[in-house]
Swiss-Prot record:
Belongs to the plant homeotic and developmental regulators ALOG protein family. Residues 178-187 have a biased composition (Basic residues). This is Protein G1. One of its GO terms (biological process) is response to light stimulus. It comes from Oryza sativa subsp. japonica. The keyword Ubl conjugation does not apply.
Length: 276
């Protein structure tokens, strides 16, 4: 079909030629699938796609290493681990004459496996299966078919994932980098550690008040008389509680909850050391 006829066909359908052209991802996925099918046809003995497993995918990935362009240094090499030797000296000459093998980069292999997995699902996954029987068992049939299709996909095998992880770790060690992320510390624990050193007795009182259940005290009850030995002793206000009334409650004053009979914040200045 000529370009003019293709343009005319696109105009009749209401779609421009740019919209009919497949995306770069789709084109690359189609080329990768053709390469894999050619590899299966050239395999000795010839291998059918329905008999393909994760082990055959690993053979295909190792076969692609022949055409790799990423030099992966090995432990005897001076450049192993990301070390850059100086410009002069025998170490630099040995690094220049490095004979480490060329491999496929981990990122290229990971993207290739992802495209082939998607291509397999399009051709032999749920798209190629007959429709499930409508009715009450339709949902169960769909879930069963999707799980069986995922299990039958050789590019989604666990061995392939482990191989990609090993390739990533080996190339990371050769380059002297790490893909492991550091664990972030929680901000709440750090703030608590910073504020835990100070506070003293006041912090202890506030913590006790926050966890203590409220005490229901009937309002309007008359206060009991003070002991005879405390007659004439002046009372003052204190933020840290009451010697007679106990800890500082949520509501201060006479009859307040959690403040005792004589209210929160009342103490005896002359007898403070005696009672404490």
């Amino acid at each position: 079909m000529s370009s003019s006829s293709a343009a005319a066909l696109g105009s009749d359908d209401g779609c421009s030629p740019a919209e009919l052209r497949p995306s770069r991802y789709e084109s690359q996925k189609r080329r990768d699938w053709q390469t894999f099918t050619q590899y299966l046809a050239a395999h000795r003995p010839p291998l059918e796609l329905r008999r393909c497993s994760g082990a055959h995918v690993l053979e295909f990935l190792r076969y692609l290493d022949r055409f790799g362009k990423t030099r992966v240094h090995e432990p005897p090499c001076p450049s192993y681990g990301g070390r850059s030797p100086s410009a002069a000296g025998p170490v630099a000459a040995a690094a220049a004459a490095c004979q480490c093998p060329l491999r496929q980069a981990w990122g290229s292999l990971d993207a290739l496996v992802g495209r082939l997995r998607a291509a397999y699902d399009e051709r032999h996954g749920r798209a190629g299966e007959p429709d499930a029987v409508a009715g009450a068992g339709a949902v169960a049939t769909d879930s069963t078919s999707s799980s069986s299709a995922a299990a039958a996909n050789p590019f989604a095998a666990r061995a392939v994932r482990l191989y990609l992880r090993d390739v990533r770790d080996a190339q990371a060690m050769a380059r002297g980098i790490s893909y492991h992320k550091k664990k972030k510390r929680r901000g709440g624990n750090m703030n608590g550690a910073r504020g835990g050193g100070g506070g003293g007795a006041r912090a202890g009182v506030n913590d006790g008040d926050a966890t203590a259940p409220p005490v229901a005290v009937t309002p309007g009850l008359p206060l009991p008389p003070l002991p005879p030995c405390l007659n004439g002793v002046p009372f003052e206000y204190c933020d840290f509680g009451s010697v007679l009334g106990g800890a500082h409650g949520a509501h201060g004053g006479h009859g307040g909850g959690g403040g005792g009979f004589y209210g929160a914040g009342v103490y005896l200045p002359f007898l403070y050391n005696t009672f404490s």
